[in-house]
Structures are given as C-alpha cells and as structure tokens.
Amino acid sequence: METPQMNAIQEEDNLSPEVAFQTPKLNDSDASSFSLSNMNAVGNVDGIPSQNRTFFASPRPSSLFYSAKEGNNSSSSIIYNPSFTFGENASSNANINEAALMKGKGNEGRRQSLKYIPAPKLVPPPPRTRSPVRGISPDAGSSKRSSMTLDSPFNFTTSTLQPHQQTPPSSAASRTSFRKGHRYKHSSVSMNFFQEPEVKIPLNIAKSLPIPDFNDLLSNLPWPKAYIQLSIAALQIFACLITFQVGHLYSWSNFITLSHFITYDIIGSLVIIFVENLSQFQVWFTGTITFPFGLNRIDVLLSFALAVSLCFVGLDLLFHIIEEFIVLFVESGSSLTNNHDHDEINEQIPHSHIANANDSQNENITLWYSILMINLVLSTLSLYKTFYANKYSNLKTKNPIITITYTAYLFIYPLLLDLLSSISDYLATLVISSLILWHGLTIARWTSTVLLMGFSTTSLSNSALFNNNDSTDTTAHTQQVESKAAKEKPSVRPRSMSSLPIATKNTKIRKTGFLNSAGFTENPTTIKNMIKDQIERLSEFKSRYILNYDDIVISKVNFTLYVVLIKITMKGGSDDDELMLRLAIDKCIQTSIPTCETTIDIDRI
C-alpha cells in the first residue's frame, strides 16, 4: 500500500490578503495534469480517465493566515491532502469523492489510504531572532491603532525621566512627574492653609567700591577752581614760614602767634580741597556693605577734628594769659624783682604769646606792616575762594576769620604801646581766645551729634516744618486778636468801595533778643513733637492707630542725609489701609525734612 506524499505549503508572503484568500482557477493543462494525478492516485473503476473538468486549485494562504491564530508563523505546522479541495463548485468535489469511495469498496487497504491521516506535529524551526517578529499589514495596523484610540480614554504618552536635567520643565504638565507629596496645592481642599511665601527682591547693594588713590585725586582736580585754591594755599605756606622766621629774628611773639593761625588756615583749605575732589567719585555718595553711608561721613569727621583743634588753640592762648597773670602776681609779691628778672621769667614760659614793647618794632615798622598786609590779603582770598566757596561752609570752621581778626589787631598794636602798653596784649589775647573757643565749640557740638548719628537741627532752619509752624502760630494769634476786638467793639461791617472782600492783615509777633523763640524751635524734642502731631492729623491715620513719641527716631548721618524710623501699632485695617498710611506718612516727612530716608514699621494687631 502506497501512502501519498504530503507536500508542505509554500509561503507566499508577497501576496496581499485578498489575493491569498481567493481561489484561483486552473488552466486546461494544469487541470488535466491535476485530474490525471488524482485519478491515478485514487483509481478509476474502468481505468479510463474521466472527462476533463474545470478544477479549482487549493488556496494557499500566506504567512498572515498562519499568524492570525496564536501567533504561529510556521508553514510546517499544517499539512493538507492534495485530494482535499474547496472552492466554488462544492457538488463536483462531492461527486468525485463519492465515486472514489464506491470504487474502493472492494479493496479495504486502498480505502484506508484515502483517509486523512494527520502527520505528526512537527517542532517549529528555531527563530532567527530571540523574539518573534510579527508582520502587520497596514490595514491591520491602522485598525488596531484606531481601536486603541477609541478604547483608551486617556492619552498616556511615553516620557523619559531625566532627574539630572539642568533646565526646569517649560510647562506645568511636564512637572507633574516631579511633584513630591500630595499637598493639594492647586485644589480647593487647601482652603489657603498653604500660602506661598512673599517674594523678596534682593537688595542691590554692592559689597565695596574702588577707593581712589593719590594719583586719581591729582588727575581729577577740577579746573580752574582747585588750582586757584591750591595756589593760595601754597602762597600761605611761604607767608607762614616768613612770618615765623621774622618773629624769631626780631623777638616778635605776635608774629609767632600769627603763624600758628595761618597754619590752621592752610590745613582747613587742604581739607576742603580734598573733600571736594573726593566727592566726584561714586564711592562718596553710594552706600555699600563696607560703608553703608558712603565716604561722605569723612567730611563730618574732618570738620569735627578741625573744630577740636581750634578749641585747643583757644585754650592755649587762654592758658598763656593765666601764666602771665601768675608771673605778675609773683613779681608783685617780691620787692627785689626788677625788669631783668621779669624778662628771665617770661623767657622760661614756653610758647609765650605776650609781646614785649621794644625799639625794634619802631625801627622796622615797614617790615611789620608789609608782612601783615601780605597775610591779610592771603587770608581774605582763602576765606572767600576756599571756605565760602564750599557747599556746606556754614556748617564748618572758618579759621581765616580768626586770622583776619588778629591781623587787624596787629595793625593798631604799635599805636597802643604808649597808651595801653601794660594791658593791651592781655585784652587782645583774651578776646581772641574767647572767639576761638566759642566758634570751635559751636562746630564741635553739632558735628559730634552727627558723628553719633543723633538728631542735629542746625540745617533745618529753612525747612517747611518751621514755616508751617509759623503759619499756625500766626493764624492762632490772628484769631485771638479778632476775638478780643469783637469783645471790645460792636460788630460793625466795614465799608468797602468795591465788591472785593477786605483783606485781613496778618501780623506776626516774634520775640527778639538774645534768648528768642527761634532757639527753642530748633530743639529736637520740639521738632519730633511737631512731626508726631502732623502725622496724627493725617486723614489716613485713624483713631485706633497708636504712635508714641519714643517710636520716632530721627538721625543725621552726614551734612545732607537724614534717616527717619517710625513704628506704628495698627489695630484692624486692611492691606490697602496700611499702604495708604505708609504713603501719607512718607509724603508728610519728605515735606518736613528734605533729603531723608524713611523706614515705617507697622505692627498690625
């Protein structure tokens, strides 16, 4: 018994699904060969080939046909019988099979050979790659993609986490994967329990600025003002040396005293030139961490030093007068003293500034007045070209005034030798020393207040604060005068020749004298009370707000800048009320105290 050979299906991957599943028709030659082979295999009763019919080839599906079931793409897993066909004419196939069965009734072995015997299940060939690759047609891929789009309600996309990404994500959606915790930040569940902190703008303050050196100062001298001032100072140096040498040569102690005064004039002139040149640089006005108020406090420090040194000069002259009185007291107690002993005692007194009348002054009267005239001219030029030319001259020492005063006294000194030879020098020295002490102490007192960052009211004489106070006093005085006149006289309407109202003349009565009211208005306590009253009269300042006297701190840090610190206790109110109150207080203080920096601390309860 011969078993028919089973032919494996050959894959035709190049065919489309429509072509693969269509039953092709055979040609006449193919059909005859196909029918003869079948008849030979099955057997004909008469042994005569049957009539040629149109046969349909068995369909050969492509690899997609096998891949549609459980992912098996092996063609060796299914074996078909060539006699088994299906197609359009099912009845013809049935007749052929029926005839074959009837022909083989007598032969049992042949009948058994017609049965379909499945071959043993072959092991699929090992894949070429580790993972099987499934071929997907474009239609199947598009249908699968569309079904996935319709079935999945969420659009999840593949994202790659990069924890070391330097730049933050550009959108809020991309930051969802980086959010830590579940804080209900953007949800109504939070109920504003987690408020964002206030964004504080960093202070734009430099740590330090370059400080100019000596070469920078020389290269930035303003022309021609600084050169004129330096020329006058150089001439004063030569005049001081000449005056000192002439005083030692002719024993004129008055000239030695004059040379000391000229020396202080030179120092003051150089300080003013240095300060004006240094003020051209940025570090002078700009505050840094190293110098919070800049370098302009150097001007205050130098003014204080000159004022203190001037006070020492006045004390030196005063002590010499006391020493001379002690010498006279000793001479008057001894009966044996004479003029020669007085000269010996006078020479033992160091730095004696009391002059002796001698004949050399009368002999060299031309030299005397020539040196005095040169010093007088140079001191006057220094006063007007250097000291008064400075912006803050009224707040600094004016040493040339003392030099000019003493030089004027020396002009008339030779004329007083005959009349007041015994007491002229004592009186002149006492007056000059008193003037120096008064001027030096006045400057030193208020410059020390500025150095200690206290409240100095010297430069507030022309402030609008005093003008407002004066206008208030004038209005109150006018009301008092009108009320007193109304009590004394009956109310009669004044006659007017025109339709315009009669103007009221406001007269201001101020006390004049040595102790006037102007000195009282410059008291820091009075000014702070005036500022406190102005703040409390503001419309934004409510009755439930509290402002104490001790909560107002005013400091003067240099010749121009004031710093005002205010603390207010605010009961109730909103953020808008707080903002409006800050703006109103700042405007009020800027009107009262110009060039000030205001810091307002509001404590809300």
From Swiss-Prot:
Segments passing through the bilayer: 226-246, 255-275, 288-308, 310-330, 364-384, 400-420, 423-443, 546-566
Cytoplasmic side stretches: 1-225, 276-287, 331-363, 421-422, 567-605
Residue ranges with Polar residues bias: 143-176, 473-482
Domain of life: Eukaryota
Primary site of residence: endoplasmic reticulum
Protein name: Protein ZRG17
Ranges of the Lumenal topological domain: 247-254, 309, 385-399, 444-545
GO cellular component: endoplasmic reticulum; endoplasmic reticulum membrane
Molecular function terms, GO-annotated: zinc ion transmembrane transporter activity
Modified residues (Phosphoserine): 16, 131, 498
Cystine crosslinks: none
Sequence segments annotated as region (Disordered): 118-178, 473-497
Any one GO biological process: zinc ion transport
Key words of the record: Endoplasmic reticulum, Membrane, Phosphoprotein, Transmembrane, Transmembrane helix
Places the protein is found: Endoplasmic reticulum membrane
Membrane-protein topology: Multi-pass membrane protein
